[in-house]
Amino acid sequence: MNKDFYISIFGDRYDREAVLFPASVTILLIVFALGNILHGYLEHIDVLDSKVHMTIFAILILIITKIMMWIIRTLSKNSIERLTYGKEKLNFPTISILLPSSSILSNEYKNRILLKAQKDFEIDLNTSISNQEDETKVRKVIAEVTNLIRKKVSRIERTETYLIKNIRYGRCRNMIGGSTIAILIQLVITIYSAIKGYSLFCPIISITISCMLDLYMFYIYKQAGIEYAKELFENYLICKNNE
């Protein structure tokens, strides 16, 4: 398969590991919940009857997967992150760990990052951060700086560790979004199954798995964000001024 075609369908490494994987898990959990209902319908349909049917079936799966990827990415970025880090995402780790009050990074390390940002982006961070008593305003200043840092880092050849941490954070966030979608759809399936007299075994097991997955991802989500933020700044510090 042509590499460009492959990327156009499945995306780059980040898309495949941080978005496609959660979307696939979400679809599988929903399909499992639909087990008894689908079995009743598929008994009357020979999906794999011909190459045409197989092609249509494959295209349908691809379309559903692409739609689910878009839904999960959109929901996770616009809802999960805002619920976790605030409406303006001012509590995001890339902001929080640079605050003077944060002990996650040493003061010396934070100063190195801020001094470099001051030179690179010609911003007077001394006045904006050190002499500012309103923490919300400080967070907004740091948010602007980290946004510039992220853009600068995106233009250089990032380390493998950075890519792994970025993917891990994105995958955690998108798994939370995906499992939340799965739970909502599974609840509808459970109610429908109860009304129609189908077995509730598959929907209940599926909901249980989705809830456990959701809780686990919430548990590691914030730590994944902190690890990503640390790696972002580490990559930034090795950037040359002209990059």
Regions flagged by a language model, labelled:
Residues 28-31, 35, 58, 182-193, ...:
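Hydrophobic transmembrane helix bundles of membrane-integrated enzymes that assemble
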Residues 78-158:
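Charge-rich cytosolic interhelical loops and cytosolic tails of multi-pass membrane proteins
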Residues 193-243:
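Alpha-helical oligomerization segments
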Residues 1-107, 198-201, 205, 221:
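N-terminal first transmembrane alpha-helix
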Residues 133, 137-174, 224-243:
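Juxtamembrane membrane-interface segments of multi-pass membrane proteins
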Residues 11-27, 149-202:
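Transmembrane alpha-helical segments and their cytosolic interface motifs
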Residues 50, 54, 127, 131, ...:
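Generic, low-specificity signal for short hydrophobic/alpha-helical stretches with a mild N-terminal bias
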